[in-house]
Amino acid sequence: INQYIQFLFSTKVETVYNAFISLIVKEDIFGQEITQIILTNYFQKQEINFRLQDNDERISPRIQEINQEYRENFNPLLSGFVHRKVFDDCIEAITNEKSIIISGNAGYGKSGCTEAILNYCEEEKIPHIAIKLDRRIPHKNCESWGHDLGFPSSIAHSIHCVSRNENAVIILDQLDALRWTQANSSEALTVCMELIRQVEYLNYERNKKIIIVFVCRTYDLENDNNINSLFKKQDTLKIDWKTIKVDVFEDDEVKEIIGKNYENFLPKLKNLLRIPSNLYIWQHLDKKEVYEKCLTTYHLIDKWFKQICRKSTTAGLQERAINEVIKRIVNFLDKTGRLYIPKQISNIGEAELDY
């Protein structure tokens, strides 16, 4: 009954429950027909608020803003968005109304999967929302988090109201970041669990299901008990999760992207470039130099970092200033346990930030 009250009312469950008891025990309703008007008037007097109405006009514009914020952070390869078979697996799961856990090592292309899902949702006009949990950290409870995101209710209830008769998709990315960046990660994960339960309950009432997509590094999914406990099935209402693992590029995929020169690379460099994030870095390196000795991700990043600093002079900036900016950012992230730094407290010049 608590879930049903939470579904219908935005006021605290205990307050609504007590109001129902008072209506039965204290009000003069014996022998009367209980109509919607009687209940509505009674709840208004008790200052109890109903939840959102279908197609609430406040929701869709805010969903678009949140999705735009999410997609701004995706950087494809220079050759463009590369279609991969794992994308088809994600789309198939969604068409079968299966909620998904996308896992993979860092840099393996999990964001490519979410980009493919978002493209599919837009093409098929499926209501959807995508959130990076390291930027929009869950806190307190679903209702409070939803308000902070700019919604009149929780994410689950909000998207339910704009998609009651069709499928909808909720993407929650960077689940593993809650473990590494938040001192109170248990609270954030509790909110995620509450959201899952809300979707489970809403789906019980829906013909077309809300589908949840979580994105998490394989290591954290397999080794963090708090994270993998989110997906354990314990009763009949529980969601059936499909885990889709993202791996490195196939050799022929990398060859097609790089071209004929790929055949001349050492085997270790070939394997290194099968990791999508490494290939992205390699594409931004000055091709006039030789990179045969780059055998680890660290080597690639070091080359790229030095190139960025070296070329800063062509933008009218001092190399020392760029080094100082990067050092300041890294120190802030290390001390705060965050993955980003607010611009207003960075004390970094506009020219350096733009560069």
Model-derived features: where do they sit?
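Charged, amphipathic alpha-helical interface modules that flank catalytic cores or transmembrane segments
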Residues: 1-97, 105, 112-120, 124
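Extended hydrophobic
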Residues: 9-13, 32, 36-40, 45-55, ...
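Hydrophobic, repeat-rich solenoid/adaptor surfaces of innate immune receptors and signaling proteins
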Residues: 84, 105-108, 113-118, 170-178, ...
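Conserved beta-strand position immediately N-terminal to the Walker
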Residues: 100
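Post-nucleotide-binding-loop coupling segment downstream of the phosphate-binding loop, primarily
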Residues: 103-169, 175-177
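Conserved P-loop NTPase "ATPase switch" module shared by AAA+ and STAND
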Residues: 161-192, 218
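Substrate-gripping "pore-loop 1 plus following alpha2 helix"
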Residues: 183-199, 227-231
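Sensor-1/coupling segment of RecA-like P-loop NTPase cores
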Residues: 199-229
